Amino acid sequence: MAGHRPSNHFCPLPGSGGGGPRGPMPLRVDTLTWLSTQAAPGRVMVWPAVRPGICPGPDVWRIPLGPLPHEFRGWIAPCRPRLGASEAGDWLRRPSEGALPGPYIALRSIPKLPPPEDISGILKELQQLAKELRQKRLSLGYSQADVGIAVGALFGKVLSQTTICRFEAQQLSVANMWKLRPLLKKWLKEVEAENLLGLCKMEMILQQSGKWRRASRERRIGNSLEKFFQRCPKPTPQQISHIAGCLQLQKDVVRVWFYNRSKMGSRPTNDASPREIVGTAGPPCPGAPVCFHLGLGLPVDIPHYTRLYSAGVAHSSAPATTLGLLRF
């Protein structure tokens, strides 16, 4: 019978009627046959290739493998729709009634633990924890993202800013909040105990995370400026002001970046580089109205403005040093 795969035919478990135990019922056998229950209580299916063994426990039945009222076909035991208690008593015995000769199947029923009847205490504890977390975070000056990173630095599981936000607002399910409870309680304990080693480690991680965020923002700003440059290599002062407002930069930074980028010519920039070289300011460009996208918004038409400088003239007073983008 090797090679046969179990199908979805089930057989009712004798003695497990409507009032019987519910939940998972692991079964062990002393032959290469395995009976395991599925989602529906009181149903068993035969599985192959399990080593001999008997489940310990007080609730055990021994079923003889001799002449059973079921006919095994392959690995499946088709059963009659119903089996009364009197019929089951003829071939189902308790171990206390005496050992059965020959091979047998030992069945152990493990009832499913009932859910807690009253979860009001759990809800109160989670509400109190969320309140304490928010108060302690604000008193220390940490952001929600800092708390998530600090939890990861201390306990190896980084939590997102959204997760911390929803936990404080109690917008997560009770099950998810209960899973996060140990980590957040440990973090509060570390902070309140003023563990110097743990706090130093946490501060180092937060500083490194701040550097990563700044570098990511610089890359994003550099890519946006490069897109603006491809549409208008020499923007007017009004265009520079608009770009600076969109990217939340100073106008001088944008103006210097465009002039320095024009000096680089058509050399492609490296998107992975977190910095762009900036230098002195250059003349704005004349010409017809220019249409280009500002960030993620709609295309904006910038009208033509009169030329203020002659070609090739730059501010001599502007510093010619190499600067990076401003840090935020």
Swiss-Prot record:
Keyword set for this entry?
DNA-binding, Homeobox, Nucleus, Transcription, Transcription regulation
Its BP terms in the Gene Ontology are: regulation of transcription by RNA polymerase II
Expression across tissues is:
Expressed in skeletal and cardiac muscles, brain, heart and lung. Little or no detectable expression found in pancreas, kidney, liver or placenta.
Q: Which CDD domains match?
A: homeodomain
Residue intervals annotated as DNA-binding region are: 210-269
> Is this entry keyworded Nucleus?
yes
Residues annotated as domain POU-specific? 118-192
Q: Kindly list the places in or outside the cell where this protein is found, as annotated in its UniProt entry.
A: Nucleus
Transcription as UniProt keyword: yes
Q: Which family does it belong to?
A: Belongs to the POU transcription factor family. Class-5 subfamily.
| Protein name, per record | POU domain, class 5, transcription factor 2
